[in-house]
């Protein structure tokens, strides 16, 4: 049974990571355009082993889940232009030409920062591409900044530290 020792809680150095201290690097997308992003997540298939009157379960294949990223869309440099340049590597709307995966898949890096700006956690998403892009809505009644929502799909993620 676990026991709770107050001295462990009160006198153990503890500095939580905070959600607002991160930098995301994706080739062709300026890091300061990124407003929000999800950290990687993985989900495993379930394999059922039936035997007489019971079921046993084991883990099946793992699938890394897509992440959602929100970008600001400034006048210069245009966030929409940066996103479309990445999309054009996989599909050119005018000609209908698709690109090889080697052209449009990129490595994306997430760094979580400590209080003094040091990197305390680093994720590298391998083989990342844009699965969906939503260039946002417009509204005469709002002064909110324009935003772009991206869904990024990737092959796998590596937690460096």
State what each model feature region is:
Residues 1-161:
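Glycine-rich, low-complexity intrinsically disordered segments
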